[in-house]
Amino acid sequence: MTHDSLRRGASHAATLIGLGAILLWSALALLTASAGEIPPFELAALTFAIGGGFGLIYAAARGRLGAFRQPWRVWLVGVGGLFGYHALYFAALRRAPPAEASLVAYLWPLLIVLFSALLPGERLRARHVVGAALGFAGAAALFAGKADGGVGAHALDADVALGYALALACAFVWSGYSVLSRRLKGAPTEAVAGFCLVTSALAAISHFAFETSIAPANPAQWAAIVGLGLGPVGLAFYVWDYGVKNGDLRLLGVAAYAAPVLSTIILVAAGFAPATASLGSPAR
């Protein structure tokens, strides 16, 4: 077996691992709904603490705590991507109609495909652009039924316009994080645990500054929070990191548009949403 074939095989395996994040994010909406009325920053603080703690235990068991000793730029990209995306997203939803803001924020897979062309040795092919554009069109169709009058209906409202701008910033932050992670592939995936723990601390500070605490009402809500921390807000970030660093970044970007569709199916199957052609919020 040649070196090139081994490298291609490793890339394909990493891409499959990265696709696991998309499957996990498909359960995000269901688990978030199951967690009750907990404020967003409080929920982020709890779930990122679980996800980061899980990664910390794993790194310690493997004797890999040295993975946290990374240059400042690695921490800036990691924490900026995780906390920056969620902080901007929460702020956008407070100002703009949720379905429309979510659709704008969900430009990130398309931006990943486009930005990947800036990486050394990468080429942007027409099929990737077409695939990403079709994926965005499909996601737009899912959200269209929930849009409250369309983006243009709120264009003169300065606060709503700010919400759209924040949602667009979300898309740039997450796509930038994903593409820059490829440039920083020397940083081990275990470092993501540190990013999660810092994100949890920043979310806790934001919660106490801007929100009123609400405790989970029952064991089912606690189970949903733990599920979020272990899955969509935990393992998903680790496998995404490995995938974007070692797999086919463009394919992962295109495939990410499957998340809203899968999320819709899960919500309908669980009885949290009617079986219609629209979706109120994205899986990521």
Regions from the language model: what does each represent?
Residues 30-38, 94, 143-159, 207-225, ...:
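Membrane-interface helix termini and inter-helical loops of multi-pass transporters
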Residues 16, 46, 101-107, 180-201, ...:
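Helix-helix packing/entry segments at the starts of transmembrane helices
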Residues 1-45, 87-88, 132, 137, ...:
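Glycine-/small-residue-enriched transmembrane alpha-helix faces in small-molecule transporters
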Residues 50, 55, 77, 115, ...:
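Hydrophobic transmembrane alpha-helices of multi-pass small-molecule transport proteins
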Residues 24-29, 62-105, 141, 230-247:
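Specific transmembrane alpha-helical segments of multi-pass solute transporters/efflux pumps
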Residues 42-53, 89-123, 170, 249-269:
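Specific alpha-helical transmembrane segments that line the substrate/conduction pathway
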Residues 14, 37-84, 109-115, 169-177, ...:
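Transmembrane alpha-helices of multi-pass small-molecule transport proteins
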Residues 14-18, 70-79, 124-137, 186-197, ...:
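Cytoplasmic-side transmembrane-helix entry/capping segments in multi-pass membrane proteins
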